[in-house]
A protein has these predicted regions:
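N-terminal small-residue-enriched
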Residues: 1-194
Length: 194
């Protein structure tokens, strides 16, 4: 907390009260009022998310992220509506600024390795960009992988437009499924694609 984990243009939030979606609620499963947590502000890590137990162990206030699949399950700290905040760039200007890259569409899943700070996400397809213009070359599916900190620090542009889609699910292995939302603005960054 208090350290740089991303470029200056990165602002990230989580919270059941941050937008209206399938992952929104008034109180978490610990009875804590839902809120909007500013995780990263101008590239600096502000805080994490927590349930009551983890907040007590860390000596912090709970963030309203105590969630469980059903009454039969234990409460864990879980994401809700996690997204990047809007930036100042138009998607058109972002595309024009790219010599060679891909415009990725239809993000559909992801997973992280919290011990090694690695991430892997997939997109339904990507449209190749050459000399600032979209081409007719489409690749599908696209896997995005790499170090979370490297990816966050590579973000140089963030679009003004933000779109949140609220019908995702997040699980812990093969169990503990809860509703989550994804989306956000378009980001210009560098990552390994395959």
């Amino acid at each position: 907390v208090g350290k740089r984990v991303a470029s200056d243009v990165v602002n990230m939030y989580d919270g059941a009260a941050s937008c209206v979606s399938a992952a929104s609620y008034f109180f978490d499963d610990d009875g804590v009022e839902a809120g909007k947590t500013n995780i990263i502000k101008n590239g600096i890590l502000q805080t994490g998310i927590s349930d009551c137990l983890s907040a007590m162990e860390l000596g912090t206030a709970p963030t309203g992220n105590g969630r469980r699949e059903s009454y039969k399950r234990k409460v864990y700290t879980r994401m809700t509506n996690t997204f990047f905040d809007a930036g100042n760039d138009s998607v058109e200007d972002m595309i024009k600024s790219i010599k060679h890259g891909y415009y990725l569409c239809q993000s559909n899943n992801g997973m992280e390795d919290p011990k090694n700070w690695q991430i892997q996400c997939t997109a339904g397809y990507g449209i190749e960009i050459v000399d600032g213009k979209l081409t007719d070359h489409i690749v599908a599916p696209v896997v995005i992988s790499g170090s979370v900190v490297d990816l966050l620090n590579s973000i140089s542009m963030v679009s003004k437009d933000v779109h949140i889609f609220g019908m995702g699910m997040c699980g812990k292995g093969h169990k503990e499924w809860v509703f989550v939302s994804d989306g956000g603005p378009y980001l210009k960054g560098k990552a390994k694609l395959s």
